């Protein structure tokens, strides 16, 4: 894979990171303690997640901050090295780029704030999905694209 293609994939990562960063900045400065009802199924509400996905280990006492930050850092470094050194189907590279941008977005929060800033809430009637952010969306999209690329490969 040439440098132009590699650069394009890193631009995807940077775009994911910046979308996450500025959306969290908006959430921090505009939401505060209030909730914005977007539509029947979605709200914007500020939440600070000290754990991992679905607040896993959120009340573990603080050590989990560095565990999750270390894990995200290792994943980010592996993704960077993979994008730089290996040639993949373009869809697999896009999936890596999305995951990288999302991982760095949440890693930034953990290192700077000690928690991840979440603000998107989906719900249906009385069922509420855990609050999440655009980094989580990028990671999820990356995993879905990875599965599609893998199925396409076979």
Swiss-Prot record:
It catalyses: Release of signal peptides from bacterial membrane prolipoproteins. Hydrolyzes -Xaa-Yaa-Zaa-|-(S,diacylglyceryl)Cys-, in which Xaa is hydrophobic (preferably Leu), and Yaa (Ala or Ser) and Zaa (Gly or Ala) have small, neutral side chains. Keywords: Aspartyl protease, Cell inner membrane, Cell membrane, Hydrolase, Membrane, Protease, Transmembrane, Transmembrane helix. The chain crosses the membrane at residues 8-28, 36-56, 66-86, 88-108, 129-149. GO terms for biological process: proteolysis. Its EC number is 3.4.23.36. Pathway: Protein modification; lipoprotein biosynthesis (signal peptide cleavage). NCBIfam families: lspA (TIGR00077). Belongs to the peptidase A8 family. This protein specifically catalyzes the removal of signal peptides from prolipoproteins. This is Lipoprotein signal peptidase. It comes from Dichelobacter nodosus (strain VCS1703A).
């Amino acid at each position: 894979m040439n440098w132009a293609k590699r650069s394009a994939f890193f631009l995807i990562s940077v775009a994911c990171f910046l979308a996450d960063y500025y959306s969290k900045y908006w959430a921090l400065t505009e939401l505060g303690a209030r909730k914005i009802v977007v539509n029947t199924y979605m709200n914007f509400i500020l939440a600070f997640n000290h754990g991992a996905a679905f607040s896993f280990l959120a009340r573990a006492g603080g050590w989990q901050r560095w565990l999750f930050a270390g894990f995200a850092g290792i994943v980010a470094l592996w993704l960077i090295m993979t994008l730089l050194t290996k040639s993949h189907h373009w869809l697999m590279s896009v999936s890596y780029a999305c995951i990288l941008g999302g991982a760095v977005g949440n890693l930034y929060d953990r290192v700077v704030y000690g928690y991840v800033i979440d603000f998107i809430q989906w719900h249906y009637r009385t069922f509420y999905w855990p609050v999440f952010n655009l980094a989580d969306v990028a990671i999820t999209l990356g995993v879905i694209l990875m599965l599609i690329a893998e199925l396409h490969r076979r």
